[in-house]
Amino acid sequence: MLKALQALTGPLAACALLSALAAPPAAAREISPQDQVRTMTRGINVLGYDPLWKDPAKARFQMRHFKTIKDGGFNTVRLNLHAFAHMGADNKLDPAWLKTLDQVVEAALAQKLTVILDEHDFNTCGEDPAACRPRLVAFWKQIGEHYKDAPDGVVFELLNEPNKGLTDAVWNAWIAELLPVVRATNPTRNVVVGPAFWNNISHLDQLKLPQGDRHLIATVHYYLPMEFTHQGASWNPATPKTGVTWGTDAERQRMKADFDGVQAWARAQDRPMLLGEFGAYDKGDMASRAAYTAAAAREAEARGWAWAYWQFDSDFIAYDIGKETWVTPIHDALVPK
């Protein structure tokens, strides 16, 4: 084969071509979770509540928006997947849904974005763990097989915000069950895992990750103080009051201390970190929202974490799809000029 190639291309070109042919595909490359986090840097949550999944013709988010995200200074998208609604009685994923997911993943990868596949049926799982468990196992068995040859820019996240019935002990047991399902087809793919109690920092010290699995990225979500970040949110009756501001020295020091606690855990466990969600709801004062968002992003960056803002569209928005423009104060807070 080498002589034939030399005759066509010359000796140096032939050797280069053979080397390229012999190189492992992108999917076979092993990237450490630390290096993965260094490439992820700034991210944003997308597509959790978009009509795309049920009827692509009604989608608000368009594939071109991945270029908007990349051009906007982001390197990662966290896809919020409510997959259970697209499973049959046998827990098989709908082929049409998988086709849509493939299109989304391919469009994001084409923009050189890291893609986190985040299984987002956290409410269902928290309310009824017994019903959730076989679905979640089936989901990761199918997704693991489906994406086993995907580039290393595709990252898995076992479950968003385990809560309620998914106590620390239950969730840790599920982690020990789910990871082997993933590893059967994706032995070195990086997987995001966070603690119970809605990925809250207060439960990070209860998170039990298998010491032998060194392809894990730990995650937490940060919305403290809730009376500020969720003020006026209809789904959270505990925070009905509006007009709450943020930005005092004491509030900033509280955030720093919270992040320092996470960093101490990360160093002790030798795990890289993803701040998988943060932000402040739209009913808050914009100046305070921008200040909070900027502070959280900079604190994460200062500690070498990747982050993903909540979210591109729907609420807490960073981008106005109707006007096809970034919400300037939020975008500037996330990606300073």
Which positions does each model-derived feature cover?
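Hydrophobic helical h-region of N-terminal Sec-dependent signal peptides
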Residues: G10-A22
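Active-site mouth of glycoside hydrolases
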Residues: I31-N190, P195-D205, H215, F316, ...
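Short, hinge-like loop/turn segments at secondary-structure boundaries
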Residues: A96, R133-L136, K208-G212, W235-P237, ...
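Sec/Tat signal peptide C-region and signal peptidase I cleavage site
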Residues: A23-A28
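Alpha-helical scaffold elements lining the catalytic groove of polysaccharide deacetylases
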Residues: C132, R254-M255
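Active-site region of glycoside hydrolase catalytic domains
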Residues: V137-E251, A257-A280, A302-A308
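Aromatic-rich peripheral "rim/lid" segments of glycoside hydrolase catalytic domains that contact
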Residues: D285-K337
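Bacterial N-terminal signal peptides that target proteins for export
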Residues: M1-A13
